[in-house]
Amino acid sequence: MDAGEVTRKSRPSKSKKKGGKGTQAISAEDEAKRREAVKEQLRQKLELERKARQVVERLLEDSVTEEFLMDCAWHITPANYKDTVEERSIAKLCGYPMCPNKLTNVPTQQYKISTKTNKVYDITERKCFCSNFCYKASKSFELQISKIPLWLRKEESPPEIKLMKQGDGGSSGQEIKLIDKPITEADIDNPIEDIPESNKDLIQGENGDIEQDFVSSVVSNQHKQVHWGKLPKRDEVSEDAAEYSHSEHEQRINGENKDESESSQTPQPQKDTTDHPALEKNASEIEGTLELLNQDKSTQQEGENTSSSQPESDISVPVAGDLNITQVGMSKRSAAGLKGLLKDHHKAKTASTAISQCLLERLRQAFIEWRTKETMIFLYGPDYASGMQLSTAGAWEEEQLDEDDLDEAEVGVRSAEGGPSRTSAPVPDVETLRKETEMLELRVREFYKGVCVLPEEVETAAVKETEHTQDSGKDPPLPLVDSHAQHQIQKRIVVEKLSHSLRDIVGPLRLTMSDVINDVNNLVRTFRFTNTNIIHKSPEWTLIAVVLLSVLTEVSPLLRESLASVSSLEYISCFMKELKLEDKDLHNLVLLFKPCVPIQT
């Protein structure tokens, strides 16, 4: 028994050893077959790639038929065809294989602007073709070439290739999109349908954010206005009131939904009698909410208290059908944002007003410093200076009148009595008369002798000798002193700035530069400039030009007639509005050049 058991146990071990050798032999055979299959696949790939290269070389020839090109599409890839186009362009042949033309006059730029289509094209690829048709035909053929690898096309069927015919049109290149086209309604796949007005309030109430505290106000549809309540303070009373109003609003919506569901199941024969109590209940709830919200407004003005208490009297006795109550809500965050926008608008308005006032004050100071006595003489003539002198002398006489009135009164009394009004000349001395007589006799004798020299001739000779001496010792001309040179530079700067601004003004005023430039130059020559009062910005120079043209109406009838026209007045008014100024501000600046304003020395 023991020997039999041993033999039985040994047999399976022998069989296992034989089975292991067979498995190893089978796996070796499979590995060899797999290697042969991989080698065969590699040979096929290499063969297909070699054939594709041959096709590419064949496409580089001058004469390629249509049938051959259509057959080649199944044996090459898009990359092979791009290599074909590039190689043909290097050989100065058209990139389209069916075109035997040579490439001449190849453009050097990268982009082309088409004036017919108002588009920009990238002509990098277009340079490889002789015409737009060849470029478009080549791109069309390239798009039809299959992108499947060559060694996987055995199970696929060759696609149908269609080549473009002559006259189908061409393409200038790849279009460059400078701007994106706006999205139209047709581009949207599933547009949202418009929600009826009757369902908008219900949807907004159901989808509202529970965490937002709403500040509500009750208005009447009859007035077509919405009055937003002021933002309440963050205290316990306002928060409780907001939470209370929000909870009441949710309960009201839930109650309405429940009533609608019940009404859909059971008939309502007494509809009019049930609507009235519900409306009264809603009005009472809204009234209680408003009373809680208005507790924080006790410190406001009397007018605001009156407006806040007005809704109570309006809704205290609601009548069904006569008054439609609408509840308008806005979150506290939105109310704070709206309040910030209003503050920013007010600040911007205040800042613009301050800037305008600063501009006017700066120009006013500059005009006062510019104006001189020569300016007034140029504008109003030399009579202005004499009139000012007479007025000054008269004022001085009036001041001295208080001191000299007694002396003048005494002189008047003496003249009335016949006394001398002035002291007589003194009586000449006898010795002086005798000497003068001797001198006259001596001059008469010398005159008859021919040696007389009159004093007038002596004085004339002395003057000529003095002039000759001065001419002989005259200094050479010297350049301007620094102060004068700076003044000339400042005048030139002002004239350039004014000329630049006048070019934009004379057109709307129906004038030309030749009509005003001479008067402007003459007026600028009379100004007194410094290194600070000629520094202005472009809008300021334009306003200065308008002021000077208004001032020059005193000397130029053409300017006076032009500025008095309706179109000129409208243009100047619009210009002042753009600068946030008024017409009276321009008038006040012009008045600075009137004689009534004293000249700064």
From Swiss-Prot:
A zinc finger (RTR1-type) spans 71-154. Keywords: Coiled coil, Cytoplasm, Hydrolase, Metal-binding, Nucleus, Protein phosphatase, Transcription, Transcription regulation, Zinc, Zinc-finger. Residues 1-36, 221-278, 297-317 are annotated as: Disordered. Residues 24-62 form a coiled coil. Its EC number is 3.1.3.16. Residues 9-20 have a biased composition (Basic residues). It is an enzyme of class 3 (hydrolase). One of its GO terms (molecular function) is RNA polymerase core enzyme binding. It catalyses: O-phospho-L-seryl-[protein] + H2O = L-seryl-[protein] + phosphate; O-phospho-L-threonyl-[protein] + H2O = L-threonyl-[protein] + phosphate. Residues 243-261 have a biased composition (Basic and acidic residues). Disulfide bonds: none annotated. Residues 297-313 have a biased composition (Polar residues). GO terms for cellular component: cytoplasm; nucleus; transcription preinitiation complex. Gene3D superfamilies: 1.25.40.820. It is found in: Cytoplasm; Nucleus. Protein phosphatase that displays CTD phosphatase activity and regulates transcription of snRNA genes. Recognizes and binds phosphorylated 'Ser-7' of the C-terminal heptapeptide repeat domain (CTD) of the largest RNA polymerase II subunit POLR2A, and mediates dephosphorylation of 'Ser-5' of the CTD, thereby promoting transcription of snRNA genes. Downstream of EIF2AK3/PERK, dephosphorylates ERN1, a sensor for the endoplasmic reticulum unfolded protein response (UPR), to abort failed ER-stress adaptation and trigger apoptosis. Belongs to the RPAP2 family. Associates with the RNA polymerase II complex. This is Putative RNA polymerase II subunit B1 CTD phosphatase rpap2. It comes from Danio rerio (Zebrafish).
